C-alpha cells in the first residue's frame, strides 16, 4: 500500500466519522423534541409529502411545506459561514457545524417561548410548533442546501436563494427574510400586508 492510498483511507474514515456525528446530532434533536412532548407526526394521524396550505393545522407538520425553501437557504448560509470560519477543514466538519446550528434552532423554535413569539409577532396565529417529522426534515433540507452550495458556483447559489425568497414571498407573503424580520423587529405594515393573503 502506498502512502497516498493510506492517506485516502484515513480521509474516508474521517469523513464517515464526521457524517456519523451529524446523524448523532439529528438523533439528539429528535430525542430532545420527543422529551419536550412534541408530536411525532401531524395530529391528523397521517403524513403528507407536501402541505401547501400555510394557514392550516397541517403546516409545519408534514414532510415539506412552504418553509422548506427557507431551510435550504439556511444550508446555503451555513456553508458560507463554514467556508469563512473553517476554510481549511474538510466539508464534513463544516457540515457538522451547520447541523449543530440548525438542530439547535429546531429545538429552540419548538419551545413555548419561541412558539408564543411567532404567534404574537407574526401572522402565524395558529402556529403550535413543528412535528418531530417536520423538524427533522427541515434539518435535512438544510443539509441538502449545504451540500448543494458546496457544489454550485457562488453566483448560482445566490441566484437560487433570491429566486426562492422572491417566489415564496410572492406566493405566501412570507420567506426567510420576512420571518427573521418579524421575529426580531415586527412591523405592523408587514403584518398587515401578510394578513391580506
Swiss-Prot record:
<feature type="transmembrane region" description="Helical">
    <location>
        <begin position="66"/>
        <end position="86"/>
    </location>
</feature>
<dbReference type="InterPro" id="IPR019691">
    <property type="entry name" value="DUF2585"/>
</dbReference>
<keyword id="KW-0812">Transmembrane</keyword>
<keyword id="KW-1133">Transmembrane helix</keyword>
<keyword id="KW-1003">Cell membrane</keyword>
<feature type="transmembrane region" description="Helical">
    <location>
        <begin position="152"/>
        <end position="172"/>
    </location>
</feature>
<comment type="similarity">
    <text>Belongs to the UPF0314 family.</text>
</comment>
<protein>
    <recommendedName>
        <fullName>UPF0314 protein NGR_c32320</fullName>
    </recommendedName>
</protein>
<keyword id="KW-0472">Membrane</keyword>
<dbReference type="Pfam" id="PF10755">
    <property type="entry name" value="DUF2585"/>
</dbReference>
<dbReference type="GO" id="GO:0005886">
    <property type="term" value="C:plasma membrane"/>
</dbReference>
<feature type="transmembrane region" description="Helical">
    <location>
        <begin position="16"/>
        <end position="36"/>
    </location>
</feature>
Amino acid at each position: 500500500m502506498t502512502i497516498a492510498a493510506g492517506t485516502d483511507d484515513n480521509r474516508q474514515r474521517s469523513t464517515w466519522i464526521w457524517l456519523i456525528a451529524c446523524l448523532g446530532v439529528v438523533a439528539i434533536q429528535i430525542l430532545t423534541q420527543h422529551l419536550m412532548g412534541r408530536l411525532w407526526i401531524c395530529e391528523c394521524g397521517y403524513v403528507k409529502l407536501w402541505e401547501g396550505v400555510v394557514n392550516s393545522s397541517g403546516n409545519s407538520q408534514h414532510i415539506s411545506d412552504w418553509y422548506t425553501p427557507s431551510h435550504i437557504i439556511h444550508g446555503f448560509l451555513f456553508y458560507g459561514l463554514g467556508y469563512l470560519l473553517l476554510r481549511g477543514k474538510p466539508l464534513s466538519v463544516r457540515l457538522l457545524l451547520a447541523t449543530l446550528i440548525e438542530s439547535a434552532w429546531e429545538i429552540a423554535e419548538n419551545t413555548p417561548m419561541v412558539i408564543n413569539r411567532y404567534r404574537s409577532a407574526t401572522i402565524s396565529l395558529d402556529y403550535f410548533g413543528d412535528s418531530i417529522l417536520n423538524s427533522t426534515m427541515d434539518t435535512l433540507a438544510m443539509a441538502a442546501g449545504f451540500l448543494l452550495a458546496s457544489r454550485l458556483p457562488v453566483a448560482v447559489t445566490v441566484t437560487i436563494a433570491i429566486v426562492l425568497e422572491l417566489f415564496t414571498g410572492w406566493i405566501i407573503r412570507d420567506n426567510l427574510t420576512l420571518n427573521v424580520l418579524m421575529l426580531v423587529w415586527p412591523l405592523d405594515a408587514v403584518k398587515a400586508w401578510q394578513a391580506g393573503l
